[in-house]
Protein backbone atom coordinates (compact mmCIF):
# COMPACT_ATOMS: atom_id res chain seq x y z
CA UNK A 1 0.00 0.00 0.00
CA UNK A 2 1.45 3.37 -1.04
CA UNK A 3 0.83 6.74 0.58
CA UNK A 4 0.18 10.08 -1.13
CA UNK A 5 3.91 10.42 -1.87
CA UNK A 6 3.98 6.95 -3.49
CA UNK A 7 6.09 5.59 -0.63
CA UNK A 8 5.19 2.35 1.17
CA UNK A 9 2.93 3.08 4.16
CA UNK A 10 4.29 0.18 6.17
CA UNK A 11 0.84 -1.31 6.81
CA UNK A 12 1.15 -4.74 8.42
CA UNK A 13 -1.47 -7.46 7.85
CA UNK A 14 -2.29 -7.36 11.55
CA UNK A 15 -3.38 -3.72 11.19
CA UNK A 16 -6.04 -4.51 8.55
CA UNK A 17 -9.49 -5.33 9.96
CA UNK A 18 -11.52 -5.41 6.74
CA UNK A 19 -11.14 -5.07 2.99
CA UNK A 20 -13.72 -3.88 0.44
CA UNK A 21 -13.40 -3.85 -3.33
CA UNK A 22 -14.60 -0.68 -5.02
CA UNK A 23 -15.12 0.01 -8.71
CA UNK A 24 -11.86 1.96 -8.86
CA UNK A 25 -9.74 0.48 -6.08
CA UNK A 26 -9.55 -1.23 -2.72
CA UNK A 27 -10.66 0.08 0.68
CA UNK A 28 -8.73 -1.05 3.75
CA UNK A 29 -10.19 -0.57 7.23
CA UNK A 30 -7.26 -0.40 9.65
CA UNK A 31 -7.09 -0.46 13.42
CA UNK A 32 -4.54 2.34 13.51
CA UNK A 33 -4.11 5.80 11.98
CA UNK A 34 -1.52 6.55 9.28
CA UNK A 35 -0.61 10.21 8.96
CA UNK A 36 -0.62 11.90 5.55
CA UNK A 37 2.98 12.47 4.48
CA UNK A 38 2.48 16.24 4.41
CA UNK A 39 1.88 16.07 8.20
CA UNK A 40 5.17 14.33 8.97
CA UNK A 41 7.46 15.80 6.30
CA UNK A 42 9.96 18.66 6.59
CA UNK A 43 7.53 21.06 4.88
CA UNK A 44 4.84 20.61 7.56
CA UNK A 45 5.81 23.72 9.60
CA UNK A 46 5.44 25.87 6.48
CA UNK A 47 2.03 24.36 5.75
CA UNK A 48 0.48 25.20 9.13
CA UNK A 49 2.36 28.33 10.17
CA UNK A 50 0.82 31.63 9.06
CA UNK A 51 4.25 33.30 9.19
CA UNK A 52 5.54 30.95 6.46
CA UNK A 53 2.75 31.25 3.86
CA UNK A 54 5.02 32.72 1.19
CA UNK A 55 7.47 29.85 1.12
CA UNK A 56 4.70 27.25 1.29
CA UNK A 57 3.05 28.95 -1.70
CA UNK A 58 6.35 28.51 -3.51
CA UNK A 59 6.54 24.84 -2.51
CA UNK A 60 3.10 24.19 -3.99
CA UNK A 61 3.63 26.30 -7.10
CA UNK A 62 6.93 24.58 -7.90
CA UNK A 63 5.60 21.14 -6.83
CA UNK A 64 8.49 20.73 -4.40
CA UNK A 65 6.11 18.89 -2.08
CA UNK A 66 6.48 15.89 -4.41
CA UNK A 67 9.95 15.14 -3.08
CA UNK A 68 9.90 17.05 0.23
CA UNK A 69 7.09 14.70 1.30
CA UNK A 70 9.05 11.60 0.33
CA UNK A 71 9.82 9.49 3.39
CA UNK A 72 12.46 7.50 1.50
CA UNK A 73 14.83 10.47 1.49
CA UNK A 74 16.16 12.66 4.30
CA UNK A 75 16.17 16.45 4.03
CA UNK A 76 17.22 19.33 6.24
CA UNK A 77 15.01 22.31 5.48
CA UNK A 78 15.69 25.84 6.73
CA UNK A 79 12.39 27.71 6.42
CA UNK A 80 12.47 31.52 6.19
CA UNK A 81 9.51 33.37 7.68
CA UNK A 82 7.47 35.89 5.71
CA UNK A 83 9.28 38.74 7.49
CA UNK A 84 12.70 37.45 6.48
CA UNK A 85 11.56 37.52 2.85
CA UNK A 86 11.32 41.31 3.03
CA UNK A 87 15.09 41.53 2.50
CA UNK A 88 15.86 39.39 -0.56
CA UNK A 89 18.63 40.88 -2.69
CA UNK A 90 17.77 39.92 -6.26
CA UNK A 91 20.74 37.98 -7.72
CA UNK A 92 19.55 38.83 -11.23
CA UNK A 93 20.31 42.50 -10.50
CA UNK A 94 23.99 41.87 -9.70
CA UNK A 95 24.82 42.47 -13.37
CA UNK A 96 22.97 45.79 -13.41
CA UNK A 97 24.27 49.24 -12.51
CA UNK A 98 21.88 49.25 -9.54
CA UNK A 99 21.34 46.27 -7.24
CA UNK A 100 17.71 45.61 -6.36
CA UNK A 101 15.94 44.14 -3.38
CA UNK A 102 12.64 42.22 -3.38
CA UNK A 103 10.16 42.44 -0.54
CA UNK A 104 7.75 39.53 -0.85
CA UNK A 105 4.13 39.87 0.29
CA UNK A 106 1.27 37.40 0.69
CA UNK A 107 -2.32 38.38 -0.10
CA UNK A 108 -4.76 35.73 1.20
CA UNK A 109 -7.73 37.64 -0.25
CA UNK A 110 -6.68 36.92 -3.83
CA UNK A 111 -9.16 34.51 -5.40
CA UNK A 112 -6.56 33.35 -7.93
CA UNK A 113 -4.03 31.40 -5.88
CA UNK A 114 -1.37 32.03 -8.53
CA UNK A 115 -1.52 35.75 -7.70
CA UNK A 116 -1.33 35.55 -3.91
CA UNK A 117 2.40 36.27 -3.68
CA UNK A 118 3.86 39.47 -5.12
CA UNK A 119 6.91 41.60 -4.46
CA UNK A 120 7.71 45.28 -4.16
CA UNK A 121 11.09 46.12 -5.72
CA UNK A 122 13.58 48.57 -4.24
CA UNK A 123 17.01 49.89 -5.14
CA UNK A 124 19.63 48.64 -2.72
CA UNK A 125 22.99 50.16 -1.81
CA UNK A 126 25.24 47.14 -1.22
CA UNK A 127 28.08 49.25 0.24
CA UNK A 128 25.97 51.06 2.82
CA UNK A 129 23.56 48.15 3.23
CA UNK A 130 20.62 50.52 2.77
CA UNK A 131 17.33 50.23 0.94
CA UNK A 132 16.70 53.38 -1.09
CA UNK A 133 14.04 54.06 -3.75
CA UNK A 134 10.93 52.01 -4.46
CA UNK A 135 10.95 51.27 -8.20
CA UNK A 136 7.85 49.15 -8.72
CA UNK A 137 6.15 45.82 -8.13
CA UNK A 138 6.40 42.32 -9.55
CA UNK A 139 3.09 40.48 -9.84
CA UNK A 140 4.04 38.08 -12.61
CA UNK A 141 3.73 34.59 -11.03
CA UNK A 142 6.50 33.28 -13.28
CA UNK A 143 9.06 35.79 -11.99
CA UNK A 144 7.93 35.28 -8.40
CA UNK A 145 8.25 31.50 -8.74
CA UNK A 146 11.72 31.94 -10.24
CA UNK A 147 12.98 33.91 -7.24
CA UNK A 148 11.33 31.58 -4.72
CA UNK A 149 12.92 28.61 -6.48
CA UNK A 150 16.31 30.20 -5.85
CA UNK A 151 15.42 30.68 -2.18
CA UNK A 152 14.12 27.13 -1.79
CA UNK A 153 17.13 25.59 -3.52
CA UNK A 154 19.51 27.37 -1.15
CA UNK A 155 17.54 26.37 1.96
CA UNK A 156 17.20 22.63 1.31
CA UNK A 157 20.02 20.25 2.21
CA UNK A 158 19.74 16.67 1.01
CA UNK A 159 20.85 14.86 4.14
CA UNK A 160 21.04 15.48 7.87
CA UNK A 161 22.88 18.56 9.13
CA UNK A 162 22.98 16.89 12.55
CA UNK A 163 25.41 14.18 11.39
CA UNK A 164 28.47 15.85 12.92
CA UNK A 165 29.90 17.70 9.91
CA UNK A 166 30.15 21.47 9.54
CA UNK A 167 29.91 22.03 5.80
CA UNK A 168 27.02 21.00 3.57
CA UNK A 169 25.89 21.60 0.01
CA UNK A 170 22.37 22.79 -0.64
CA UNK A 171 20.10 21.56 -3.39
CA UNK A 172 21.07 24.63 -5.40
CA UNK A 173 24.79 23.84 -5.08
CA UNK A 174 25.63 26.50 -2.49
CA UNK A 175 27.97 25.66 0.39
CA UNK A 176 26.79 26.41 3.93
CA UNK A 177 28.44 26.09 7.32
CA UNK A 178 26.42 24.85 10.29
CA UNK A 179 27.69 25.20 13.88
CA UNK A 180 26.36 24.29 17.34
CA UNK A 181 23.66 21.98 15.98
CA UNK A 182 23.05 20.41 19.39
CA UNK A 183 22.02 23.82 20.78
CA UNK A 184 19.06 24.04 18.41
CA UNK A 185 17.22 27.36 18.47
CA UNK A 186 19.31 28.46 21.46
CA UNK A 187 22.62 28.62 19.61
CA UNK A 188 22.70 26.80 16.27
CA UNK A 189 24.07 29.03 13.50
CA UNK A 190 23.94 28.74 9.70
CA UNK A 191 26.19 30.65 7.31
CA UNK A 192 26.39 30.98 3.57
CA UNK A 193 29.42 32.53 1.89
CA UNK A 194 28.11 36.07 2.49
CA UNK A 195 27.61 35.51 6.22
CA UNK A 196 31.04 33.85 6.50
CA UNK A 197 32.75 36.77 4.73
CA UNK A 198 30.87 39.31 6.83
CA UNK A 199 31.29 37.37 10.08
CA UNK A 200 27.53 37.56 10.62
CA UNK A 201 26.01 34.08 11.11
CA UNK A 202 22.25 33.51 11.13
CA UNK A 203 20.73 31.87 14.21
Predicted regions and their residues:
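Mature, structured domains of secreted/extracytosolic soluble proteins
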Residues: 1-203
